Design a protein with these regions (language model features):
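Juxtamembrane intracellular "pre-TM" segments in multi-pass secondary transporters
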Residues: 2-13, 212-251
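Helix-to-loop junctions at the C-terminal end of transmembrane segments
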Residues: 75-89, 300-314
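Glycine-rich segments within core transmembrane alpha-helices of 12-TM secondary carriers
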Residues: 154-176
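Hydrophobic core of transmembrane alpha-helices in multi-pass small-molecule transporters
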Residues: 104, 115-133, 255, 338
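Short amphipathic helix-loop junctions that connect adjacent transmembrane helices
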Residues: 29-59, 265-286
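Structural signature of the two symmetry-related core transmembrane helices
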Residues: 92-107, 316-331
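C-terminal membrane-cytosol helix-exit motif in multi-pass small-molecule transporters
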Residues: 168-177, 197-217
Length: 338
């Protein structure tokens, strides 16, 4: 295939299309159906789970595995990105994490408390596959798009991700709600995990077909190359010390991102545990529909925020949005009924 030129429409669309492929993971697995499925495995909200030689609360176990996965990603990202840049095969790394995540999603079909460690391995694979592939996916942007194209194509990727993930969630929602009993609903949830894995791997093929593979350098991977990513981070940190404004921004973003990611990952567990639902069926339907509505509101919110930024500026808009978000988080603390 002819190598597409940097900035070409076809190349940019192929890059953005990966959001369509992988965003189904964050919506179906991380945010909606898997948390409901996981909670349904226990007889009561307070039932403990045994794993790694400890007895702990259900949601604590998932939080610990999630936190560990993020630590692994943080440690591996500089190493793998350094190797990929040196050897010239970032697409292969992106493929590896994509297929790892896809296999993990499909493996969740066999999630069973009797085999909790194997089950958590599948969960770990899905999570690290998603975030690991994003490292290389995002690194492609400056290679394929000119600076004046990057904002628009990133926004297009987010939009495609929203649309694709909502589309599959609607299908999964119909599957779950079509069942008359809890056992049937749980079965459909497990099938939903398979659809996510297949969707992710299948639709990513177009992206992999179009994106450049990179020029192989023929260099061997040495100890120096493996840790070169950390050396680059060290140099970046030295430069940050000289730019006080950028340093403050990154510190603020760290705190902001930590809060947002916590809400995104734990919202359904909170809704399942703290809200007084009339029945399990109402809980399942209510939480999934809530997640779906949130996605639709997010699309409208992104459009309104973009317009507000154009009129009032990014800083003022961001401050206003953060205050609204903080108010809603505090308000959610006092909610007890649907």
């Amino acid at each position: 295939m002819i190598q597409l030129k940097k900035g070409s429409k076809k190349l940019l669309n192929a890059w953005a299309f990966y959001d369509w492929a992988n965003s189904v993971y964050t919506l179906t697995i991380a945010s909606s159906i898997f948390p409901l499925f996981y909670s349904s495995l226990f007889n009561s909200k307070d039932e403990l789970v045994s794993a790694f030689g400890f007895q702990m609360k259900q949601e604590v176990l998932i939080m610990l595995v999630t936190a560990f996965t993020f630590l692994v990603v943080v440690f591996l990202s500089p190493i793998l990105s350094g190797i990929a840049d040196y050897v010239g095969n970032k697409k292969n790394f992106m493929k590896f994490f994509c297929y790892l995540g896809s296999a993990g999603c499909i493996g969740l079909y066999w999630f069973d408390l009797n085999y909790i460690h194997l089950s958590l391995l599948f969960y770990f694979m899905g999570l690290i596959g998603y975030w690991g592939s994003l490292v290389f996916y995002n690194s492609y942007l400056p290679d394929i798009a000119f600076e004046d194209q990057q904002d628009s194509i990133s926004a297009k990727g987010f939009s495609m991700g929203y649309i694709g993930s909502v589309l599959l969630l609607v299908i999964n929602l119909a599957m779950v709600m079509s069942q008359e009993d809890e056992a049937g609903a749980i079965k459909m949830m497990k099938y939903s995990f398979i659809t996510v894995g297949i969707w992710w791997a299948l639709f990513s093929q177009y992206t992999f077909y179009i994106l450049p593979s990179g020029v192989s350098s023929g260099h061997k991977v040495t100890k120096y190359v493996i840790f070169n990513g950390f050396r680059e981070l060290k140099e970046v940190w030295k430069q940050l010390k000289q730019n006080l404004r950028l340093k403050r921004y990154l510190n603020a973003f760290f705190v902001f991102s930590m809060a947002v990611q916590t809400i995104m990952l734990m919202a359904v567990y909170f809704g399942e545990k703290e809200i007084d639902w009339a029945s399990d069926s109402e809980k399942t339907t209510g939480l999934i529909v809530s997640i779906l509505v949130i996605q639709l509101v997010a699309i409208a919110g992104a459009i309104l925020t973009s317009k507000a930024s154009s009129k009032y500026g990014n800083i003022k808009t961001l401050i206003a949005v953060n205050f609204i978000w903080m108010f809603l988080c505090v308000y959610a603390y006092f909610i007890k009924t649907p």
